[in-house]
A protein has these predicted regions:
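An accessory alpha-helical subdomain
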Residues: 103-126
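Conserved G1/Walker A P-loop phosphate-binding module
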Residues: 129
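A glycine-rich (often HGG/GG-containing) alpha/beta subdomain
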Residues: 1-102, 106, 110
Length: 129
């Protein structure tokens, strides 16, 4: 499979041969992923029963469920995002208003980090003179 391409296919239980769903699979290769690691996304329909069946199947086949915040932690540890951006992910998830959403997006896109870096550069320049 080529990374960063979308594949459409059937999710089939190998034990029964029965199709569970039609789904999209997107493989990502390090470092070109959110976490900076090899990863795959599986997109299937949203029925809670169906999702439970698909998750049970992929776990039986060797996958495991991620812990809350695990992908963001891995992205931070692998240098894909900085601490302000990592905290902004939690803010995005918790946003309950337009103002909260805009604030979290500004942090997530690196606006605060860029301003902090500019201030740091200016201070270092002053200290060097």
């Amino acid at each position: 499979m080529q990374p960063n391409r979308v594949y459409f296919g059937e999710v089939v239980d190998p034990d029964t041969g029965k199709m569970l769903d039609r789904a999209l699979l997107i493989p990502f290769r390090a470092p070109r992923s959110y976490t900076g690691e090899d990863i795959a996304e599986l997109h299937c329909h949203g029925s809670p029963y169906l999702l439970r069946r698909v998750l049970d199947l992929v776990c039986r086949l060797g996958a495991r469920l991620a812990q809350p915040g695990e992908f963001t932690m891995r992205a931070f540890l692998n240098g894909k995002i900085d601490l302000a951006q990592a905290e902004a992910v939690a803010d995005l998830i918790r946003a309950r208003s337009e103002a909260q959403l805009r604030s979290a997006l500004a942090l997530h896109t690196g606006a605060l980090s860029q301003k902090a870096q500019s201030l740091s550069d200016a201070l270092l320049s002053l200290l060097a003179t």
